[in-house]
Amino acid sequence: MQNQEPSQLTIKICLLAGKLILQNGGETYRVEDTMNRIAYAYGIESSHSYVTPTGIIFATDGASQITRLVRISERSTNLLKVSMVNDISRKISKGELCAEDAYRQLKDLEEKSYEYRELYKVLAAAAASGCFLIMFDGKWSDFLTVFLIGGVGFLSFLMLHRLVPVKFFAEFLTAIIIGASSSLAVYLGLGGELDKIIIGSVMPLVPGLHITNAVRDLMAGHLVSGLSKGAEAFLTAFAIGAGIATVLSFY
């Protein structure tokens, strides 16, 4: 019984670390590598992990084989949390953290949000929209218009995502709002190039991280995860395109 308890705690640490990385935008290979390194550092020499965007399976070999499953229902992007889990993992590998302290630090990390306030997110999205306008050869005279539309669009997405749990529909409705606002701005003479205004305003919604992770997982041989993330990115892009097309069909 004395040998079993540390193994149970180690498995909890591995699963919690993997869950935090996967939930906050980490790659599949990083999750598997982190879990295996933690297990090895705490004396589990042979362990196996299977990770997909919606779940983690972790198993150990030996006299008492143990298999655990954790389901991932929500995913976001918080690279600070990923970095903090990596720091904890490195301390574990160096022998600087006992199992109890590591588990407590991971639980504290799970309970804290470490997110910017929504005002900062909206301002960042608005600034990014304006910069993308210039990057795509837009006019400086449209910068303020795109700044406002991009900010309003991202704020609408945050609010709609609370009301509509399905992210696809929230993105679709947000794209409609952005398309309608852009068309209205051009109609009122507040903007010049409709296409550049729309492109700049929707860029904060584009799933760049999902596309990057999908390609990275496919290149690493994680076909299930790569295709899943690629499909999620495709649905997001389709929702944005469908929303804009809906508005332009009436323009």
Predicted features and spans:
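Generic secondary-structure signature for well-ordered alpha-helical cores
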Residues: 23, 27, 40, 44, ...
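Cytosolic regulatory modules rich in charged/polar residues
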Residues: 29, 101-118, 168-169, 197-200, ...
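Alpha-helical transmembrane segments and their cytosolic membrane-interface
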Residues: 74-142, 229-240, 248
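C-terminal ends of transmembrane helices
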Residues: 105-109, 153-164, 210-223
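Core alpha-helical transmembrane segments of integral membrane proteins
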Residues: 115-188
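Soluble N-terminal domains of membrane-associated systems
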Residues: 1-97
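Generic detector of multi-pass transmembrane helix bundles and their immediately adjacent loops
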Residues: 187-251
